[in-house]
């Protein structure tokens, strides 16, 4: 008989990010601005066995919710991630992240000559060219960027 144990303890209130591709938890923590000086509990499970993905990463963040920009950024690196909102140790809401058709004002264009990188008041705007592998295109200069370009 297979033994089942909970490797990361439950949280009372906060957010669980599950089904992160194995090895990408640190990138998600970076997206969320979570560093070593936080004043809330953050639990990270990396390379956790998964029936759906073989291996996955999981992040539990006590007393913290995520905004739309953070969810959009997570969808770029973990397009199949599941978000669970926890209240009093119970899941109050559960949903998958969703890559929007356009990303406006949340990432920078890598083209230094793009109008969005000058002193003009223009927000960067990207269209999704491909989801797997991730390819984005700047609507202003047409520069394409992959996942590595976005997170460098």
Curated annotation (Swiss-Prot):
The keyword Metal-binding applies. Zn(2+) binds at residues 109, 114, 138, 141. Keywords: Metal-binding, Pyrimidine biosynthesis, Zinc. This is Aspartate carbamoyltransferase regulatory chain. Pfam families: PyrI, PyrI_C. It comes from Thermoplasma volcanium (strain ATCC 51530 / DSM 4299 / JCM 9571 / NBRC 15438 / GSS1). GO terms for cellular component: aspartate carbamoyltransferase complex. Its cofactor is Zn(2+). GO terms for molecular function: metal ion binding. The keyword Zinc applies. Involved in allosteric regulation of aspartate carbamoyltransferase. Binds 1 zinc ion per subunit. Belongs to the PyrI family. GO terms for biological process: 'de novo' pyrimidine nucleobase biosynthetic process; pyrimidine nucleotide biosynthetic process. InterPro entries: Asp_carbamoyltransf_reg_N, Asp_carbamoylTrfase_reg, Asp_carbamoyltrfase_reg_C, Asp_carbatrfase_reg_C_sf, Asp_carbatrfase_reg_N_sf. Contains catalytic and regulatory chains.
């Amino acid at each position: 008989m297979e033994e089942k144990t909970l490797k990361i303890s439950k949280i009372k209130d906060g957010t669980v990010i599950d089904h992160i591709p194995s090895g990408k938890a640190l990138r998600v923590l970076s997206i969320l601005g979570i560093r070593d000086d936080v004043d809330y509990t953050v639990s990270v499970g990396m390379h956790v066995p998964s029936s759906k993905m073989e291996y996955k990463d999981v992040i539990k963040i006590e007393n913290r919710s995520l905004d739309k920009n953070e969810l959009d950024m997570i969808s770029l690196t973990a397009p199949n991630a599941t978000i669970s909102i926890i209240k009093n140790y119970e899941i109050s809401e559960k949903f998958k992240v969703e890559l929007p058709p356009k990303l406006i004002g949340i990432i920078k264009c890598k083209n230094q000559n793009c109008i969005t990188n000058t002193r003009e008041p223009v927000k960067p705007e990207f269209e999704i060219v491909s989801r797997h592998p991730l390819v984005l295109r700047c609507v202003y200069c047409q520069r394409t960027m992959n996942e590595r370009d976005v997170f460098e």
